[in-house]
Amino acid sequence: MRVIVYVSVGNSDDRLTQAEWHDFHVAMRAEVVTYAAVIHGEWFSDPVAKWQNASWCLEFDSNQDMIVAKKNATRIRTEFRQESVAWATAATEFI
């Protein structure tokens, strides 16, 4: 069963320094995004925007891969003092 998930992270509360934001993004990419079978998209805020954000559209081959990625996202969020990661599981409809 394939699962589509949109994942979004940000630093709108300005808790992370630029170096910490970099490390947060690298950790998310390494320990969440890489579990996806397909990366349908990867988006970032404007480099000169007041706040930093990143989003991914991910397709997982299995529910188990998605669960591991979600647990990793929760752990990373906690390590980097972030209140949340947006995790939206999409019911995909082909029309």
Regions found by a protein language model. Name each.
Residues 8, 12, 17, 56, ...:
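Extended, folded cores of ATP/NTP-driven motor/assembly subunits in large transport
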Residues 10-15, 33-34, 46, 77:
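Alpha-helical interaction segments
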Residues 22-28, 67-80:
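Short amphipathic alpha-helices in soluble, non-transmembrane regions
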